[in-house]
From Swiss-Prot:
InterPro entries listed in its UniProt record: Myo_ane_neurotoxin_sf, Myotoxin
UniProt keyword terms in alphabetical order: Antimicrobial, Disulfide bond, Ion channel impairing toxin, Myotoxin, Neurotoxin, Potassium channel impairing toxin, Secreted, Signal, Toxin, Voltage-gated potassium channel impairing toxin
Subunit structure, as described in the record: Monomer.
A GO MF term: potassium channel regulator activity
Lineage of origin: Eukaryota, Metazoa, Chordata, Craniata, Vertebrata
Name of the protein in question: Crotamine CRO3
KW Transmembrane (keyword) present: no
Subcellular location: Secreted
Tissue specificity comment: Expressed by the venom gland.
Amino acid sequence: MILYLLFAFLFLAFLSEPGNAYKQCHKKGGHCFPKEKICIPPSSDFGKMDCRWRWKCCKKGSGK
């Protein structure tokens, strides 16, 4: 029972820290969006960088 609680706590701890997951993208002032989203203007599309698979980095507020 204790192991289940410990696992749940650690899992939630990792989920609650999304800002630390994509440091390269965030350093450019960006945020990770699904690859299908369009970054506006196109110059705000930083590419994949360190976002997860099939996601890309866009300047914050540009994902539409």
